[in-house]
């Protein structure tokens, strides 16, 4: 077990969560004369860059190693934050998004793969949960710091964000690479095996995508509309955002939870919980209950992300890890386009329709997850019979 890697990843997660301007990123851009339409185009550039660079980064990572890939990606991450600080025009922010896309696609799967290989398999879930917890803690500290120090100095918030990301770039040099098992190296160029692995994982990737995107959309875009409809004053939104981030710290309890409840059974419980919450918010007219429901949604989303990191890494046996994880991520980014458009159409009709669509997605996700779980269980039993005739 590479204990130094674990501690370094916790520090990196915290530092990269310190985005001091996150709560005013829209205002920051509008102050530079960027319109909302231009912001949409800028975010589209990010999405395109992530899709374009995802698989190439996976291939590069399998060739040069996890540590070097993370160091290079964190270098681009720092440059993206520096570009954001310096940007004053549309093209300046486009450059920032391109750099961020390169960094995000490089880190995607690579950091979790190295972390997974740095701990015993039975401790992976808890480690992923704590890593997510430290990232959330960083976001909470950033939100508080903005209110205390940067509320009248947006440029200062961007500068200190860049400084924190430079620190994470430097710290990433202290990571130690972990070599893959020999059998994985022997099939490093096996595109067929990689494709077969992705095909087997398709149902669970669809399932997790439907749950996480449903919860993310509701808690990021539609919660404010719900708060207004139940009479919560706008000045409370910042505090509720802080509480929502704190709820994400619950991922630190995953190790304890999965010791008592089998991982896949707990995942199924999260799907049921998400569907019930989506239906419940339709009939909710209470301010307190609305807040509680959205906090529970954040909890379900955060825990699903952490558990999926374990499931995805566990599925890789005999294929190049980074390339396979990149293909998983590529599929999910493509799926995000579908869910985003679907929620947009539903929300244009009514908020109730968007909540109902979320419930449908979660039920479909549950069915897809159960299908994957049963197929995997049958495959495991078959392999056990063949190995013990």
Indicate where each model-derived feature is located.
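Helix-to-loop junctions at the C-terminal end of transmembrane segments
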Residues: 54-65, 150, 250-263, 347
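Paired small-residue
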Residues: 91-99, 288-296
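Helix-loop junctions on the cytosolic side of multi-pass membrane transporters
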Residues: 161-164, 169-185, 371-383
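C-terminal ends and interior cores of transmembrane alpha-helices
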Residues: 75-88, 272-285
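Cytoplasmic helix-loop-helix junction between adjacent transmembrane helices
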Residues: 98-136
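Transmembrane alpha-helix termini and helix-breaking/packing motifs in multi-pass membrane transporters
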Residues: 140-159, 228-230, 256, 337-355
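Juxtamembrane intracellular "pre-TM" segments in multi-pass secondary transporters
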Residues: 1-3, 176-206
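Helix-loop boundary and gating motifs at the non-cytosolic
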Residues: 1-52, 200-242
């Amino acid at each position: 077990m590479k204990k130094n890697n674990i501690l370094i990843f916790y520090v990196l997660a915290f530092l990269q969560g310190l985005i001091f301007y996150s709560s005013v990123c829209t205002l920051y851009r509008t102050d530079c004369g960027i319109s909302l339409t231009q912001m949409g185009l800028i975010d589209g550039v990010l999405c395109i860059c992530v899709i374009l660079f995802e698989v190439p980064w996976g291939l590069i990572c399998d060739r040069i190693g996890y540590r070097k890939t993370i160091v290079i990606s964190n270098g681009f991450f720092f440059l993206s934050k520096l570009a954001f600080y310096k940007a004053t025009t549309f093209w300046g922010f486009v450059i920032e998004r391109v750099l961020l896309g390169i960094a995000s696609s490089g880190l995607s799967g690579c950091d979790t793969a190295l972390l997974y290989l740095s701990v015993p398999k039975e401790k992976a879930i808890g480690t992923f949960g704590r890593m997510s917890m430290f990232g959330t803690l960083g976001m909470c500290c950033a939100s508080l710091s903005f209110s205390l120090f940067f509320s009248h100095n947006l440029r200062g918030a961007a500068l200190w964000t860049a400084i924190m990301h430079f620190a994470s770039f430097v710290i990433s040099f202290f990571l130690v690479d972990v070599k893959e098992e020999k059998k994985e190296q022997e099939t490093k160029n096996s595109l067929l095996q990689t494709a077969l692995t992705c095909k087997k994982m398709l149902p669970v990737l669809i399932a997790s995508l439907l749950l996480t995107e449903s919860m993310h959309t509701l808690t990021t875009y539609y919660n404010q509309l719900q708060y207004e409809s139940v009479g919560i004053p706008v000045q409370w939104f910042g505090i509720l955002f802080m509480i929502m981030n704190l709820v994400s710290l619950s991922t630190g309890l995953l190790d304890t939870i999965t010791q008592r409840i089998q991982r896949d059974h707990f995942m199924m419980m999260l799907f049921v919980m998400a569907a019930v919450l989506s239906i419940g918010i339709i009939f909710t007219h209470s301010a307190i209950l609305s807040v509680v429901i959205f906090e529970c949604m954040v909890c379900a989303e955060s825990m699903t992300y952490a558990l999926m990191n374990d499931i995805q890494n566990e599925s890789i046996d005999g294929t190049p890890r980074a390339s396979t994880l990149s293909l998983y991520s590529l599929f999910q980014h493509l799926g995000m386009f579908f869910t985003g458009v679907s929620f947009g159409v539903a929300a244009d009709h009514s908020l109730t329709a968007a909540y109902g669509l979320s419930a449908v997605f979660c039920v479909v996700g549950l069915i897809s997850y159960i299908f994957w779980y049963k197929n995997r269980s049958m495959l495991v039993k078959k392999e056990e019979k063949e190995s013990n005739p």
